[in-house]
């Protein structure tokens, strides 16, 4: 039997201890310590980060980050005032690329740069497709207190920030059967075999919807269990009684190498698996009594050919969960609430890199968990 360990490094002090709440596994699973050297700090140009909206590791093992410059706390923006009221800081561009060592490689984007397309009011989700293009979306489903419009779109850019495509647009939702507008879409994945973009359209709608990734032409859509999506107001499921026949916050979507499509039904604490045509395959439920943010935030696949494991972000329990992809079995679980290095506060997303390390995003930071023991890719 093994126990997971995490090294918590802070300033010049470090200690190593057992991670609380670990489920011991009978088979080899990856083990992690915190890499407190990532990213390289301070960030250049006196940059400060707002809320982290999405992260993704590309084919070059680079971490891409999407944050909201407009949500950098005002007290941190003294340098950007006219005249300056402090030595720190200015809001960083919305999209930042880091190498595996944590160095900033390039950065671009933000609402002030949006010309000819609709920048999201409340950013959500980042994905890098097989061509290297960057996809971002937004989760706002109604008019904001500041008058900002609902987010009904996903945007596609080249790696250097050139606008390429907008699917949907601003405006209130017309419902889960409308194919012209999204409603608080949370995430996308692009299938290299068909060049189709699969969208988790889940904060306002209750569906997976598929478009051509170059033209934006609508292809198909489905709801829970592969049935037509509906907008019935259903309570969240706690694992008792019959499972609901509708999604409740479709928060992630990932296409595996074998063609299976994994969908996170966040507030119902489950993953549903489909064929690419929407045919239902399987359902996996995790910590069904979890309320709050739910137990199924997002998944990422282990970087071997078989994609042996998935890492599951459990935001409601502040956990990282390692799952065997073949049958959805939970193999290990670690993590704890807190704001110290190595702890989680509003953990929103977790991603494997090409070496099996894990990046976690939460509020205003990204942490890197370095693989040290157990099975490696």
Each predicted region: which residue ranges?
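N-terminal secretory signal peptides that target proteins for export/translocation
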Residues: 1-6
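Bacterial N-terminal signal peptides
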Residues: 7-20
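Eukaryotic scaffold repeat domains enriched in small/polar residues
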Residues: 24-377
């Amino acid at each position: 039997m093994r126990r997971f360990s995490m090294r918590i490094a802070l300033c010049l002090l470090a200690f190593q201890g057992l991670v609380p709440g670990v489920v011991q596994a009978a088979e080899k699973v990856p083990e992690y310590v915190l890499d407190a050297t990532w990213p390289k700090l301070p960030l250049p140009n006196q940059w400060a980060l707002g809320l982290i909206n999405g992260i993704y590791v590309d084919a070059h093992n680079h971490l891409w980050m999407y944050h909201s410059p407009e949500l950098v706390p005002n007290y941190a923006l003294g340098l950007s005032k006219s005249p300056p009221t402090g030595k720190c800081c200015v809001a960083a561009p919305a999209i930042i690329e880091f190498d595996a060592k944590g160095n900033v490689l390039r950065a671009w984007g933000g609402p002030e740069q949006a010309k000819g397309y609709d920048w999201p009011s409340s950013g959500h989700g980042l994905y890098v497709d097989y061509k290297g293009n960057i996809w971002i979306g937004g989760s706002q489903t109604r008019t904001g207190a500041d008058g900002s419009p609902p987010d009904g779109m996903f945007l596609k850019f080249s790696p250097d920030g050139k606008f390429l495509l907008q699917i949907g647009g601003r405006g209130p939702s017309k419902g889960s059967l409308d194919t012209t507008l999204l409603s608080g879409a949370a995430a996308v994945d692009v299938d290299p075999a068909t060049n189709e973009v699969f969208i988790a359209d889940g904060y306002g709608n209750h569906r997976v919807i598929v478009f051509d990734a170059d033209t934006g032409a609508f292809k198909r859509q489905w709801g829970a269990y592969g049935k037509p999506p509906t907008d019935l107001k259903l309570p969240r499921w706690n694992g008792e009684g019959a499972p609901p026949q509708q999604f409740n916050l479709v928060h992630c979507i990932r296409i595996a190498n074998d063609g299976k499509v994994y969908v996170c039904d966040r507030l119902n604490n489950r993953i549903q698996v489909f064929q690419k045509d929407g045919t239902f395959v399987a359902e996996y439920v995790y910590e069904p009594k979890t309320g709050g943010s739910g137990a199924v935030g997002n998944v990422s696949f282990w970087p071997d050919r078989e994609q042996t494991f998935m890492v599951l972000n459990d935001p409601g329990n502040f956990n990282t969960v390692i799952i065997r992809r073949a049958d959805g079995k939970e193999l290990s679980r670690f993590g704890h609430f807190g704001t110290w290095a190595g702890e989680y506060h509003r953990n929103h997303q977790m991603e494997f890199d090409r070496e099996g390390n894990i990046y976690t995003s939460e509020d205003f930071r990204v942490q890197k968990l370095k693989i040290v023991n157990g099975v490696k890719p």
